[in-house]
A protein has these predicted regions:
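Extracytoplasmic/peripheral linker and loop segments enriched in polar/acidic and small residues
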Residues: 347-349, 400-411, 439-509
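Long beta-strand-rich cores associated with HINT superfamily self-processing modules
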Residues: 505-528
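Periplasmic-binding protein-like
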Residues: 265, 291, 295-336, 383-384, ...
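Ligand/substrate-recognition segments at binding pockets and active sites
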Residues: 199, 239-242, 258, 353, ...
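N-terminal lobe/hinge region of extracytoplasmic solute-binding protein
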Residues: 35-85, 116, 185, 497
Length: 528
């Protein structure tokens, strides 16, 4: 019996689990105990794109704009904005009552410093920076953007969830963008309790009593954020069986990523709700290192893409229910504005094993090792890794599998060292599927070298086409460029698409007000 089968049968049979403390319920203290995808190693949502950090940071930090359930950007920290000079000047005004968790008021210069830090690290932020003449704070309430070229998607970009354009005090925003901030001080509805953090065990967030919510009804990340409980605990439980058993027993309240094979068992429990929260899903991918080793060779990357059967990967990730995934997919997510069929035969009609071996030989591959970082503590990434590694080995690729936890990979993937000095070749990841909608927001298509996301591809042709897409006002020309950028990606392989998966969450039925959108959020949620 495989591991998943063992876990499923073990839960059904009531196998022994470690005892877990009950969350505080009743009286003056109400705690939601949430089991995230993996260990929380940093709260800096600019420094990393880790999903666990994104979800935790959303409680603590705010953004100038937030997206509603339909992903429309709405004012959040700003009261509103005006656009003048044919789109070249944006003036944003902060709303009243904004205060950081250290007691200081939020002022415009905090926002300017925070946004400049974000623009250094984020792909779309870099695009804005390229089009920016000046971002200034003429007074405590006002931000003024002076652009070289119009950028109508500015509010949408500032509302993105990963990497997030979080606003922090100026003293923290002045931290080197490639180093972690020393503190997690935001202005959101919950504050981070650094003194109670235990790596690999828990992270604590407390209601911020001085938070001033917007007056509008909440919809996902737009409107009035209201903390309805006193505390949220992120409890780290790497073992899927233990986590599911704890939820079934009422020892925890919410599983972000239950093992797909355990969904049936969880659905059978009277106190458990199994439902989608992230209704847009996740884009599973492999990211190759474009600087060092065999994966720096585009021919090798094309052969590796050809070796992957997306349906096999998604079946391993989500189990046998095809309604929970879409595969095969290209470099844009199906149903988004830029999705197209250009080059899709590369993933729909895969070459034979012998043909893939011939591709490797033609690329000059001679059995050099590929270091694959395999996160065994992440349910979905673990499954992606296992299928991908087996597929690569099957066509003769020498894979050195390095099994570790996701937190270690989040830190290690920042290294640009060669393989012989502890570097890496590839790792799996999940990106917010809703962002892979066009060449602007599909940031991992970018070929801007050392400024690109981990893996650091350099592709001037892709950058030229991306800029042309942004400058165009002709929908037909943009459609042509959608196809051209996808064809280019099939040639250069900035990342390897594995499919789109739509995992449901599982939570206790006494949690009410759980919001749907593009990620889990903890405001508006009550616990009975």
């Amino acid at each position: 019996m495989n591991r998943r089968g063992l876990l499923a049968s073990g839960i059904a049979a009531g196998m022994v689990r470690p005892a877990l403390a009950q969350p505080a319920i009743g009286g003056k203290s109400v705690t939601i105990v949430h089991v995230p995808q993996g260990n929380l190693v940093t709260m800096d949502a600019v420094w990393t794109t880790a999903v666990v950090t994104r979800n935790a940071a959303a409680m603590v930090f705010e953004t100038l704009y937030g997206r509603d359930e339909a992903l429309n950007p709405k004012p959040q920290m700003v009261a509103g904005h005006t656009v003048e000079e044919n789109g070249l000047r944006w003036t944003m005004t902060l709303r009243d009552g904004l205060r950081f968790h250290d007691g200081t008021p939020v002022v415009a210069r905090d926002c300017v410093a925070s946004l400049k830090r974000w623009m250094t690290r984020d792909g779309i932020g870099q695009t804005i920076a390229d089009r920016l003449n000046e971002l200034s704070a003429p007074d405590d309430k006002t931000l003024v953007w002076r652009l070289k070229k119009p950028f109508s998607a500015l509010p949408y970009a500032l509302a993105k969830t990963q990497p997030t354009a979080i606003i922090v005090p100026e003293r923290l925003a002045n931290t080197d963008p490639f180093k972690q901030m020393s503190e997690a001080i935001g202005s959101g509805p919950f504050r981070y309790v650094a003194g109670e953090y235990v790596s690999g065990h828990r992270a604590i967030f407390e209601k911020f009593d001085k938070y001033n919510p917007r007056p509008e009804p909440v919809s996902f990340a737009a409107g009035g954020y209201r903390a309805m409980v006193d505390r949220v605990e992120f409890r780290i439980i790497p073992d899927a069986f233990t986590a599911a058993g704890a939820l079934a027993a009422g020892e925890v309240d919410w599983l972000d990523s239950p093992l797909p094979d355990l969904l049936g068992m969880l659905k059978s429990k009277p106190g458990v709700e199994v439902a989608p929260i992230d209704i847009y899903g996740t884009f599973g991918c492999l990211r190759p290192n474009h600087l060092h080793g065999p994966t720096a060779n585009a021919g090798v990357r094309r052969a590796m893409l050809a070796a992957i059967d997306q349906v096999d990967v998604m079946t391993a990730v989500m189990g046998g229910d095809p309604s929970l995934y879409r595969a095969p997919v290209g470099f844009y997510i199906p149903g988004t504005p830029s999705a197209n069929d250009a080059g899709m035969d590369r993933v729909r009609k895969r070459p034979t094993k012998d043909q893939i071996k011939a591709m490797l030989k033609e690329a000059g591959y001679a059995g050099e090792k590929i270091v694959f970082m395999h996160p065994t503590d992440q349910v979905y990434y673990d499954a992606m890794s296992a299928v991908a590694i087996a597929a690569f080995r099957d066509v003769g690729i020498n894979v050195e599998e390095q099994s570790t936890d996701w937190g270690t990979i989040v830190e290690r993937r920042t290294s640009k060292e060669p393989l012989e000095k502890g570097g890496w070749s590839m790792f799996p990841y999940g990106a917010p599927a809703a962002e892979y909608r066009d060449p602007i927001f599909a940031t991992n298509l970018r070929g801007n070298g050392g400024a690109a996301w981990f893996g650091w591809p350099t592709d001037r042709e892709m950058e030229t086409m991306r800029n042309a897409w942004m400058d165009s006002t002709d929908p037909a020309e943009q459609k042509r460029l959608d196809a051209a950028t996808q064809l280019r990606a099939f040639e250069t392989v900035p990342y390897i698409p594995l499919g789109q998966y739509l995992p449901p969450a599982a939570y206790r039925k006494n949690l009410l007000g759980v919001l749907k959108g593009a990620m889990p959020v903890f405001w508006n949620v009550t616990k009975g």
